């Protein structure tokens, strides 16, 4: 485990919603592949939630291709670590949200394919960028008005800090 994001605000929750995810760490020339939300001004690593009965690696490949247009080279995939997140749901105070976010260092083919975005992703203007890690960290820590919990932005900033400390970037 890289680290945990535990709000400790879930006393009284009566049920758990679990949705694990897989995220790609693709590094080129000291920059990382990130999906940028033009609408809300934040960055996230390409990737997303695991479907029922889907492996983390399969979700990594599928979600990265859909969100960014980058096709991961399967032989390059290496586990980096995971971030454990647990907190009360933002929409249901009786629900505890639990998520393990699995990060994989990998390479992608040079060609960028068309994105296959979900409705909300297209509405947010998801765009693939290769970004300077410090720019991402600064942007994600700047206060913003979004429908999302700021823990998501902090998660990505902290993973980038770990990658910098470990000399990947």
For the regions a protein language model found, what residue spans apply to each?
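Nudix hydrolase/Nudix homology domain
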Residues: 42, 112-169
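Short, solvent-exposed loop/turn segments at secondary-structure junctions
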Residues: 16, 42-43, 85-88
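A short coil-to-beta-strand element that immediately follows conserved catalytic motifs
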Residues: 71-82
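A generic structural micro-feature
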Residues: 16-18, 93-100, 120-125
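Active-site-adjacent beta-strand/loop module that shapes the phosphate/pyrophosphate-binding cleft
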Residues: 85-115, 129
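Hydrophobic pocket-lining residues within nucleotide cofactor-binding pockets
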Residues: 50, 83, 108, 133-136
